[in-house]
Amino acid sequence: MKKRIAGILTAALIGTTVMGTVVMAAPSGAIDVISREDGSGTRGAFVELFGIEEEKDGEKVDMTTQEASITNNTDVMLTTVAGDENSIGYVSLGSLNDTVKAVKIDGAEATAENVADDTYKVARPFNIVTGDKLSDAAQDFINYIMSSDGQDIIEKEGYIKVDEKAEAYKAGDAKGKVVVMGSSSVGPVMEKLAEAYQKTNKNITVEVQVSDSTTGINSATEGVCDIGMASRELKDEETEKGVKATEIAKDGIAVIVNND
């Protein structure tokens, strides 16, 4: 990702000046950078993939420009970019809609097919996060997510399934409630999974609460929820607290601009 659009985007996000033609240039020539909030898995994955970070005192530091406008979830990002013809931002590929335009990266369009065959390289995992003490109800819901039934829903919603050979779901005898918390990028597909699952297994209810990846990971760690959602890899210091990540899908990150 060292071609022009990647360079322009990186420069815009860290607040430096780039000479040359911006592929999706705004009428005024200015670029309004729209970023996600600290704690967002999409932001964390994005700055890592584009190298928008520096190492300081042994730790990687996010170098997103202080001039960036911050949005706190996926829907707000889409609405903000759709309403500002000078803007550039980024969003989960599965959440991309026709209110904005996705730009090509290294000549590749942001599509699920291109993510699957590694043509489009701006991609990250969708993880669920669990602790050691998992309820039978939560385990049954996870079994559904990883079954062919769940993986087919993931693919239908525009994401990339992680198990092409998954077997069909077989309901157990668990009962109860499952609370899922975290990433606003994972949230939409998790809600679809929960809806379909509850039609199949009427003995279990699933509540999905959307926030961000870090909140989801922390909530799973502290036992506030049964399952956390994260749209990034977990850090060593997070897994050291006793939680583990399970990849349920793969998702691209689309770089987006205004349709005009």
Where do the model's predicted regions map?
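Exported/periplasmic ABC-transporter solute-binding proteins
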Residues: 4-10, 24-260
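C-terminal segment of classical bacterial N-terminal signal peptides
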Residues: 16-24
